[in-house]
């Protein structure tokens, strides 16, 4: 089967928070263009990991409807600005960023004091304006994740009650479009051409996003390559009957009956269950009285009844 080719035919990275690329994948079999395009679009939008500010703590503020003296924006507006800040974290652990600014000044993302594992994508991104004599002191939690996390879920996972939770958007891919064209070369069988457009927030390039999405799909389908259709042993997960493992000493038999069973290599109740009442009489020196004793002991102590019929495996 011939492999398709992928080509980036257009790319625009002029804006730090808006990267765009257009890809062409061809040739694909009829119908595969929609299949591949839809799968890639879904993974690009929902399964790629990104970074977001998930909570903030502002000095002197206890709720999001408060104001900070000397700051033009109220707390709710500051939270909304922090929600829009584009960051990239190289750590799987939550990180803490800090901000301490005195007015008068215009605060941007360049004022952030960030851990070495975190970088800001656009240092010019606006946060707030402070007047003369004003001061803004803030800590904010930075996390990696997928998709969208609500405030309610953030509160459930929060480790500090004085942080104000934020609806967090982790998705590094902002938008995906795809279309399928029919192509035919020299009168051959028509094929599909997939045109895929990807917009990202700058924390990842469209090429990196597409590669990651393809890797996720490969990992998802890879186990299907080695499907085993052999029947499984339905009894393998059934635990052994603990009663069957009881030694025959627990039956408190007479010495004669006990010794006869031991010489016949009957050491547990499980061994006894291989016998019928008639089979017991075939054991050397094991008479009718001993057989009745064993049958009665099994019934009385364990509620087990040996069948009467002669077994074909003990002759």
From Swiss-Prot:
Its EC number is 2.7.7.6. The keyword Aminoacyl-tRNA synthetase does not apply. Residues 1-228 are annotated as: Alpha N-terminal domain (alpha-NTD). One of its GO terms (molecular function) is DNA-directed RNA polymerase activity. InterPro entries: DNA-dir_RNA_pol_insert, DNA-dir_RNA_pol_RpoA/D/Rpb3, DNA-dir_RpoA, RBP11-like, RNAP_asu_C, RNApol_insert_sf. SUPFAM superfamilies: C-terminal domain of RNA polymerase alpha subunit, Insert subdomain of RNA polymerase alpha subunit, RBP11-like subunits of RNA polymerase. It holds the Pfam family RNA_pol_A_CTD. GO terms for biological process: DNA-templated transcription. Residues 243-315 are annotated as: Alpha C-terminal domain (alpha-CTD). SMART domains: RPOLD. Keywords: DNA-directed RNA polymerase, Nucleotidyltransferase, Transcription, Transferase. It catalyses: RNA(n) + a ribonucleoside 5'-triphosphate = RNA(n+1) + diphosphate. It is an enzyme of class 2 (transferase). Gene3D superfamilies: 5' to 3' exonuclease, C-terminal subdomain (1.10.150.20), DNA-directed RNA polymerase, insert domain (2.170.120.12), RNA polymerase, RBP11-like subunit (3.30.1360.10). One of its GO terms (cellular component) is DNA-directed RNA polymerase complex. The N-terminal domain is essential for RNAP assembly and basal transcription, whereas the C-terminal domain is involved in interaction with transcriptional regulators and with upstream promoter elements. Homodimer. In cyanobacteria the RNAP catalytic core is composed of 2 alpha, 1 beta, 1 beta', 1 gamma and 1 omega subunit. When a sigma factor is associated with the core the holoenzyme is formed, which can initiate transcription. Belongs to the RNA polymerase alpha chain family. NCBIfam families: PRK05182.2-2 (NF003516), PRK05182.2-5 (NF003519), rpoA (TIGR02027). DNA-dependent RNA polymerase catalyzes the transcription of DNA into RNA using the four ribonucleoside triphosphates as substrates. This is DNA-directed RNA polymerase subunit alpha. The gene is rpoA.
């Amino acid at each position: 089967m011939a492999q398709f080719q992928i080509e980036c035919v257009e790319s625009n990275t002029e804006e730090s928070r808006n990267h765009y690329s257009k890809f062409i994948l061809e040739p694909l079999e009829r119908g595969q263009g929609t299949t591949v395009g839809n799968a890639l679009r879904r993974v690009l939008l929902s399964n790629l990991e990104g970074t977001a500010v998930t909570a903030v703590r502002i000095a002197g503020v206890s709720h999001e409807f408060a104001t900070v003296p000397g700051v033009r924006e109220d707390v709710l507006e500051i939270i909304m600005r922090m929600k829009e800040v584009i960051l990239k974290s190289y750590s799987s652990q939550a990180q803490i960023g800090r901000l301490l600014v005195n007015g008068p000044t215009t605060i941007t993302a360049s004022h952030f004091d960030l851990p070495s594992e975190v970088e800001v994508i656009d240092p010019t991104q606006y946060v707030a304006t402070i007047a003369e004599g004003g001061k803004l002191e803030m800590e904010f939690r930075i996390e990696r994740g997928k998709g969208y996390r609500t405030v309610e879920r953030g509160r459930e996972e929060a480790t500090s009650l004085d942080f104000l939770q934020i609806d967090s958007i982790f998705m590094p891919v902002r938008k995906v479009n795809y279309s399928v064209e029919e192509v035919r070369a020299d009168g051959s069988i028509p094929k599909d051409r997939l045109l895929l457009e990807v917009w990202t927030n700058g924390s990842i390039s469209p090429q990196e996003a597409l590669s990651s999405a393809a890797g996720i799909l490969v990992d998802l389908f890879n186990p299907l390559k080695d499907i085993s259709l052999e029947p499984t042993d339905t009894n393998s997960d059934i635990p052994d009957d603990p009663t069957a493992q009881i030694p025959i000493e627990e039956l408190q038999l007479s010495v004669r009956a006990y010794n006869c069973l031991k010489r016949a290599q009957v050491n547990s109740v499980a061994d006894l269950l291989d016998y019928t009442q008639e089979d017991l009489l075939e054991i050397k020196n094991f008479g009718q009285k001993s057989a009745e004793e064993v049958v009665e002991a099994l019934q009385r102590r364990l509620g087990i009844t040996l069948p009467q019929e002669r077994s074909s495996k003990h002759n």
